[in-house]
């Protein structure tokens, strides 16, 4: 008979009743009926590096406040004998959980203590083995060890952030915020006295195809290069507590699901702990109040720390410096991952605030988009810390809005965004865009993001990731400085140049030359930021290069790399030889959005792709392509597969594909066609043969 210790050592036991075979402490005068009975299980005996171990505690006793009346302490011992402390949290009636993402390979052990306010205690032990997964996880984000403005992952690989955020709420009260999401809609039809719109196909009022769902949102943005998601409670979102003595269990659960969904689609998470909640910001001497703030900080770390990369204390709030002097060390003391910390309003001069996170809304003249971005970047970087602009977008005067347009969008918005983004990349800062896309006139500020904006981001991110983690700002000299501004990045092996024609965006720049010091023995690729076209390939020599610049109208980039020509869809054909750069099956010359694989047609030219356009031809009559008398945008199951696209659980992740409705791993391939649904590196067929779960990335055959 194998002992409990032996079973734990081999990982063959995944659950244990704490009452049996482990220590139990109870009051001396307690009856047998007062024994604290707890059962704990763990989600797997084998956890890939940086993936999440989850321990569940089943306990049926009733408590007045189960968030506070039960305390769970987990002491983990790493393979190198380091001890790490994490806490548990209340999940739902009868269930508590604890989470941990291991960052060291080998066998881990842990000791559990579960106690309540009645003086009862139960304790137990467990173990798991941390392995390197077949599909590697690069770890959490860290400040670059040599460049204070860049980030790298734990494994040392590069990270070039570009972020997005939006509103969330369970407005239909079905227990999820993911089944309803609003994407690119036209100008609204529900205004009582709508202003006249400018002429042109992009300025039309009509219905939208909303609601959609979060799978469509995260897939559309993730596959185009967005890789940072910012979320905070009470910030166009739900609250996580009624007050600091009463936490909300359902809202905690939907936050779990939201962060897990973002990570599934490749997003890293900037987590705002308090948002707009007032938390004794200007009462640093309120010991009782600050103790409650600390309690919620620890709850947040215990519950979400395994999914988060950056912590953000507040959103657009002022707090006394002494409040931060108390809270920063406390957050650092309870966070086993040492995630970088920021806040808003920004306080970059404070010790312990590791990211400068200003907010910036502007509708500048597009010819100055690079100039104003560069000026702000230089100012924000004076503190020697990474800069992630926590909110970025357009704006207009609320009292004097632009006639007929609103604040979130105009027909030059995508271009301004493109120029800002490229300039930000070359100044070592990043933006998080506040997305308000349910309507083009939905607000007086924020930004409307559609397929045009997404494909511009995809072009830039593909360029960025062909650089390396060590690129830093560099000097470039242009021959026509009264017409073109130039910016450069370079490392020992790679380099990039970005040129903006700021004189006008209508005539071509010709005869331009630039002087720049570059790594040699490689090729340079003149790259169009609008569509990734390779305009010219040149030989690069080590040292100063005097280069002839191909003619261009708005902007142009130069990529210097030894890795060969850019290939944005990784299909083996470089961009200048590839007739379908987004690999969506529609040739680029017939693709309205050749870099966005979610859209390819735009019949009315309104920059809303036909897949999400409720009126494809812009005639004011909603589409009814199946001719059943019901406008398509009102049909929840347009593809007829029996799964509605929104307002239900489960929802259809592929609402226009009758053969697909679920995407377990967020790779853009529906489970019915995907040979590895959970993306754990083990084909589904192999998992079924081995008896493991092909939909669970932590359940796979033992190698």
Question: Where are the language model's segments positioned?
Answer:
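Bacterial N-terminal signal peptides
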Residues: 11-23
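Non-catalytic, glycine-rich low-complexity segments
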Residues: 31-80, 86-88, 127-133, 142, ...
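Aromatic- and carboxylate-lined catalytic core of secreted/periplasmic carbohydrate-active enzymes
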Residues: 36-47, 62, 395-397, 405, ...
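Short strand-edge motifs at loop-to-beta-strand transitions and within beta-strands
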Residues: 53, 96-98, 545-547
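Active-site mouth of glycoside hydrolases
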Residues: 71, 117, 138-367, 372, ...
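Extended acidic/polar, glycine-enriched regions
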Residues: 75, 84-148
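Extracellular glycoside hydrolase catalytic/binding regions
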Residues: 295, 315-455
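Extracellular calcium-associated, cysteine-rich motifs in secreted modular proteins
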Residues: 564-703
């Amino acid at each position: 008979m194998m002992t409990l210790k032996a079973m734990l050592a081999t990982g063959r036991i995944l659950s244990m009743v704490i009452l049996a075979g482990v220590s139990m402490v109870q009051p001396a005068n307690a009856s047998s009926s007062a024994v604290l009975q707890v059962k704990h299980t763990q989600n797997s005996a084998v956890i890939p590096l940086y993936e999440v171990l989850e321990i569940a505690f089943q306990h049926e006793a009733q408590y007045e406040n189960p968030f506070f009346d039960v305390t769970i302490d987990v002491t983990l011992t790493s393979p190198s004998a380091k001890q790490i402390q994490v806490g548990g949290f209340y999940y739902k009636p009868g269930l508590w959980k604890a989470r941990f993402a291991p960052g060291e390979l080998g066998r881990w052990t842990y000791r559990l203590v579960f106690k309540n306010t009645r003086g009862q205690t139960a304790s137990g032990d467990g173990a798991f083995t941390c392995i390197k997964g077949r599909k590697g996880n690069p770890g959490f984000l860290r400040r670059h060890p040599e460049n204070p403005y860049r980030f790298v992952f734990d494994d040392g690989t590069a990270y070039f952030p570009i972020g997005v955020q939006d509103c969330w709420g369970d407005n239909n009260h079905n227990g999820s915020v993911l089944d309803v999401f609003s994407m690119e809609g036209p100008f609204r039809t529900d205004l009582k006295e709508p202003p006249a719109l400018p002429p042109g196909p992009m300025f039309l009022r009509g219905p939208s195809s909303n609601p959609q769902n979060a799978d469509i949102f995260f897939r559309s943005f993730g596959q185009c290069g967005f890789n940072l998601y910012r979320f905070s409670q009470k910030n166009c979102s739900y609250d996580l507590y009624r007050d600091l003595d009463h936490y909300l269990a359902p809202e905690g659960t939907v936050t779990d699901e939201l962060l897990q969904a973002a990570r599934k689609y490749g997003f890293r998470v900037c987590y705002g702990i308090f948002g707009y909640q007032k938390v004794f910001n200007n009462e640093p001497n309120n010991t009782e109040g600050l103790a409650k703030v600390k309690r919620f900080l620890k709850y947040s770390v215990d519950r979400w720390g395994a999914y988060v990369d950056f912590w953000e204390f507040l959103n657009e709030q002022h707090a006394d410096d002494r409040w931060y002097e108390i809270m920063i060390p406390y957050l650092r003391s309870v966070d086993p991952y040492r995630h970088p910390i920021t806040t808003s309003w920004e306080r970059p001069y404070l010790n312990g605030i590791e990211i400068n996170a200003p907010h910036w809304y502007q509708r500048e003249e597009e010819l100055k988009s690079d100039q104003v971005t560069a000026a702000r970047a230089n100012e924000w970087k004076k503190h020697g810390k990474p800069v992630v602009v926590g909110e970025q977008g357009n704006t207009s005067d609320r009292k004097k809005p632009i006639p007929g347009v609103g604040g979130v969008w105009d027909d030059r918005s995508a271009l301004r965004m493109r120029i800002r983004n490229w300039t930000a990349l070359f100044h070592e800062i990043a933006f998080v865009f506040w997305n308000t896309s349910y309507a083009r006139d939905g607000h007086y500020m924020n930004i409307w993001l559609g397929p045009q904006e997404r494909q511009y981001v995809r072009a830039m991110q593909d360029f960025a990731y062909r650089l390396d983690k060590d690129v830093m700002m560099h000097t470039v000299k242009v021959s026509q400085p009264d017409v073109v501004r130039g910016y450069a990045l370079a490392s020992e092996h790679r380099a990039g140049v970005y040129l903006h024609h700021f004189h006008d965006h209508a005539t071509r720049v010709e005869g331009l030359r630039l002087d720049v010091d570059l790594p040699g023995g490689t090729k340079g690729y003149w790259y169009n930021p609008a569509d990734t076209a390779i305009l010219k390939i040149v030989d690069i020599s080590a040292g100063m290069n005097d280069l002839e610049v191909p003619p261009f109208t708005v902007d142009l980039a130069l990529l210097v790399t030894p890795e060969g020509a850019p290939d944005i869809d990784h299909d083996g054909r470089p961009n200048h030889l590839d007739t379908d750069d987004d690999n969506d099956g529609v040739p680029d010359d017939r693709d309205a959005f050749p870099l966005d694989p979610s859209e390819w047609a735009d019949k009315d030219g309104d920059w809303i792709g036909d897949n999400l356009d409720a009126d494809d031809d812009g005639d004011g009559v909603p589409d009814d392509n199946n001719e059943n008398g019901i406008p398509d945008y009102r049909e929840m199951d347009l593809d007829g597969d029996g799964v509605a696209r929104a307002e239900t659980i489960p929802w259809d992740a592929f609402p226009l594909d009758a053969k697909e409705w679920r995407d377990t791993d967020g790779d853009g391939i529906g489970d019915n066609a995907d040979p590895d649904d959970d993306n754990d590196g083990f084909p589904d067929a192999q998992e079924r043969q081995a008896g493991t779960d092909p939909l669970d990335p932590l359940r796979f055959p033992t190698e």
